[in-house]
């Protein structure tokens, strides 16, 4: 099964978004990029990969956000890039890496505002995966060998970081249905079923002509 579509996956912590992405990538014969986006950005920017990891989907302050977005929207020269604060460099290098990955062909991109970075691309399907809290607690407790209470605390903190990061760097709201093309509760169909549903959606969308999508 082949596709010409790039799929971005936002996800609640513990919703199995990455695992769902791996199933789709395997079925479509495409690559999945998660932490690999950080490695790619580090290699192309010359910034240490550990720095990307330390800033990965972490919130920043509103002043830095304005500085970053002004520079990104106006374009930047090599000299300007060199003089940027490290948070600024990391953000722009990651966005550039996402675009370059997308330019190489169909793939799955997990997190890191990939949907926003590629909003001008026509062959993109943006997905958000959520799940019932109880299911997420069980999953995280099992994976990390935690008590339910500690698993819940980790979920709340991780989701808060992801939400703050996304809301700062985009003009949208993390987890809000209006921010994505497709939102799915993985608790209802499981990993395999959710992956299949996304694949069916992508395949159907590719088969429908633009003029037939008018409502």
Q: What are the roles of these predicted feature ranges?
A:
Residues 9-22:
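Glycine-rich phosphate-binding P-loop
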Residues 31-42:
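Short beta-strand-centered segment that lines the nucleotide-binding/catalytic pocket of NTP-utilizing
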Residues 95-99, 168-215:
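NTP-dependent small-molecule kinase module
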Residues 101, 114-120:
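RNA pseudouridine synthases
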Residues 120-142, 148-156:
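Conserved phosphate-donor/acceptor-positioning beta-strand/loop module used by diverse small-molecule
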């Amino acid at each position: 099964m082949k596709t010409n579509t790039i799929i971005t996956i936002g996800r609640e912590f513990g919703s199995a978004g990455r695992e769902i992405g791996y199933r789709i990538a395997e079925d479509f014969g495409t690559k999945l990029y998660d932490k690999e986006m950080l490695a790619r950005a580090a290699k192309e920017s010359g910034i240490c990969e550990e720095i990307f990891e330390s800033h990965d989907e972490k919130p920043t302050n509103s002043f830095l956000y304005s500085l970053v977005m002004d520079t990104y929207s106006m374009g930047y020269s090599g000299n300007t890039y060199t003089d940027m604060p490290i948070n600024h460099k990391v953000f722009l290098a990651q966005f550039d890496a996402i675009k370059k990955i997308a330019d190489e062909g169909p793939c799955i991109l997990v997190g890191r505002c990939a949907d926003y970075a590629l909003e001008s691309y026509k062959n993109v399907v943006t997905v958000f995966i959520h799940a019932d809290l109880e299911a997420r607690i069980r999953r995280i407790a099992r994976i990390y060998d935690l008590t339910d209470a500690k698993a819940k605390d980790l979920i709340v903190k991780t989701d808060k970081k992801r939400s703050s990061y996304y809301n700062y760097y985009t003009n949208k709201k993390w987890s809000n249905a209006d921010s994505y093309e497709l939102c799915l509760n993985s608790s209802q169909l499981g990993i395999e079923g959710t992956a299949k549903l996304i694949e069916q959606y992508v395949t159907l969308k590719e088969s429908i002509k633009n003029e037939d999508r008018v409502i």
